Amino acid sequence: MAQLTELLIPIAKPPWTALGRELESCIRKAIYDFGLLEEGVERIAVALSGGKDSLTLLFLLHALRGRGFPLFEIHAIHVDGEFSCGAGISGGFIRSICRELGVNLITCQSTQKREQLECYSCSRERRRLVFNAAKEVGATTVAFGHHRDDSAQTLLLNLLHKAEFAANLPKVHMREYGVTIIRPLIYIEEESIRSFAKHYGFARITCQCPVGQNSKRKAVEQIIRQMEEHFPYVRGNLAKAGLLYGSNKAATP
């Protein structure tokens, strides 16, 4: 029976494959380079949609505990709702993973209606729910699963849409909410996460949003793919340029 349960619940943990070691090395480097885990941090909240990115983040952070880092508590926060980014994921699936890891799971309900759907306002609503839930358990550090490719998209999207040269920042102090956002996957490319998730059996399609499939971010991703036909390293270069030269205006919103 235990073997059957283990097969049904994908858990990624050391000892790692070569790819797992590479991802852990990248996340450690990001933590050290950007001071993501401040001294004395006791609790971290992970925004957990249940997709490959947030689960990879959860597994890697959980594996770091006690291995060069304190045994900090991890609280997973899942926003559920008809059109939320985690809508395609079974609640039982997420609960089972968190139970196996010994991670506290908090589920928040989004009340977004189809006629109200718009990516920016939806994102703000989900973040508000995550931040409030994090503070309720005493976690003032909130980790998001944004990776290198997300940062490249954000840079180009901001440049084209707002004439701003700004990518995702590794660390953002949200003064309005009294929490700090961290992005430990900032150095990791999406393809590596996809391979990691496939190896451990949690690569699942999750987005159920009827708006998201036609969003500006999707359009920017198509532009980047077209650029890659002529400039193979453009994705990594965009993300790197964002870290080196991007605006820090969003660092303390």
Set out the residue ranges of the language-model regions:
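Nucleotide-activated sugar donor-binding and catalytic core shared by glycosyltransferases
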Residues: 185
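Flexible helical/loop "lid" subdomain adjacent to adenine-nucleotide binding pockets
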Residues: 43, 153-156, 160-182, 190, ...
